[in-house]
């Protein structure tokens, strides 16, 4: 910080590694900590630069923001400060630190320039901000910004009075909250012996108030359970069987009417109709099978005659009694059949 930077007071535009652009006036550069401090800073956001997390611009103007040099992607000097004359009419010269001149008569009430006045546009070496910047050390990882870009910045009024105080309604991070509740104060230690004596007195008083009488309760005779098993009767006498049901008039045939009423109450009228339909269809199927079996029997009976058409048509249709090919069993009686 001994050497003054020639761009102090210039308007700077820098872009961080998150592609966020900031504009402000260069206040100081710390080469030891590799930090740059800007005053009157405004954030313009990412400005349509390709980034994973776009950030919108903000209209807020922050008094001071300190940036870490390693996290700055680009830096541009927009405007340099104008050369101002130093006291006494001397031109601006970085080699001049202070100027002393003769005191002029204070006709208009303005104070005269005192000896040792600092150069215009350059901060004092012992300014509070310079001391704060020199004492800053980079933190572990991340973006160490002591004056972060949010609304919780100090209201700068003529200096850094109060450090990080006077924030706009935000709590100081890292500062524990003060509990304003009043703590109980005890004049002396708690006496356990006195407390036990009071407890014993209260317990004795409560016991004296109780009326305890020894009353013997009458003994209640236990009722004996009746025998649940009679050896005289057999275990199998009450089991249902066909002989008992016949003796009582019960038959082994199911009562389809009662069963239908029970099914209708349980499953509904449509379910009972579907059950009847399935039962009837099965009966017709069985009848058809029997008919098909009869056809097979007839067909087999027809083919028992190896002779030809005579026996087959005579058995089924009742026609063609004459003519045709005679069976093999009747070859000896062919002439007799022709005579008839």
UniProtKB/Swiss-Prot annotation:
Residues 280-296 have a biased composition (Gly residues). The keyword Hydrolase does not apply. It comes from the Eukaryota. Residues 1-81 form the Sm domain. Keywords: mRNA processing, mRNA splicing, Nucleus, RNA-binding, Spliceosome, Transcription, Transcription regulation. Residues 178-214 form the DFDF domain. A motif (TFG box) lies at residues 251-271. GO terms for biological process: mRNA processing; P-body assembly; positive regulation of gene expression; RNA splicing; stress granule assembly. Residues 126-148 have a biased composition (Polar residues). GO terms for cellular component: cytoplasm; endoplasmic reticulum; mitotic spindle; mitotic spindle midzone; P granule; P-body; pericentriolar material; ribonucleoprotein complex. A motif (FFD box) lies at residues 227-243. GO terms for molecular function: mRNA binding; RNA polymerase II core promoter sequence-specific DNA binding. It is found in: Nucleus. Transcriptional regulator. Involved in modulating embryonic expression of ATP-dependent chaperone cdc-48.1. May play a role in mRNA gene silencing, and RNA granule (P-body) assembly. Belongs to the LSM14 family. This is Protein LSM14 homolog car-1. It comes from Caenorhabditis elegans.
